[in-house]
């Protein structure tokens, strides 16, 4: 009799060898890394090769080049350090100069397919010693009918309760002109304990945002005729400002109708 139920003694002319009969899968006893079960069914097939995806993900696939545009994919970067205040600041993201390079637009029309916001918000030496929490609100806006030499201020576009940027919504009479495409925030904490003097900002958004310029070549807000892309930033603390060191990259395609 064998001592274990899974053992059997196999006799051979040379020797007796004790073997273990294993009727399970050979992968059962192998040490494997823990797997993370993805609940989103669409994301589970995202990194698979095309021939292994179901038919639905092969047929109804978003095109690499936006409709009505042509390649190659061009890139424009905006790198700047800003002083984010309670009253808010604005950056024009769709400033692209007309020219022949990979950072220029060919004609009046182009489409911003995606945007990549990378950087950090931080406090200086004097502010980070104070006990406070400061949130920086980011609003990515579409200006459908740009007008004037510079974009409007934060307080002119947004309606706020008690001048609080976290409660900002578009003014009722401007909702047809301005639309909030994306909204996010980052938090820094000052004080001797639990201090978080800087916070990383890393966002990637697909927009398919069509921009139209006039006949001028310079990439300025005053030369926009349709759909300027704006980034508004405001901090929630009334007296302590925050510095934002950001690198903003837009990936765009030229329109066929130029």
Swiss-Prot record:
Predominant location category: virion
Motif window: Nuclear localization signal: 41-55
GO cellular component: host cell; host cell nucleus; T=1 icosahedral viral capsid
Protein keywords: Capsid protein, DNA-binding, Host nucleus, Host-virus interaction, Metal-binding, T=1 icosahedral capsid protein, Viral penetration into host nucleus, Virion, Virus entry into host cell, Zinc, Zinc-finger
Higher taxonomy: Viruses, Monodnaviria, Shotokuvirae, Cressdnaviricota, Repensiviricetes
Species in which this protein is naturally found: African cassava mosaic virus (isolate Nigerian) (ACMV)
This protein's name: Capsid protein
Summary of the function given for this chain in its UniProt record: Encapsidates the viral DNA into characteristic twinned ('geminate') particles. Binds the genomic viral ssDNA and shuttles it into and out of the cell nucleus. The CP of bipartite geminiviruses is not required for cell-to-cell or systemic movement.
Motif mapping: Nuclear export signal: 102-123
Assembly with partners or alone: Homomultimer. Binds to single-stranded and double-stranded viral DNA. Interacts (via nuclear localization signals) with host importin alpha-1a.
Motif Bipartite nuclear localization signal, chain ranges: 3-20, 202-249
UniProt family annotation: Belongs to the geminiviridae capsid protein family.
InterPro entries noted in UniProt: Gem_coat_AR1, GV_A/BR1_coat, Viral_coat
Gene3D superfamilies (alphabetical): 2.60.120.20
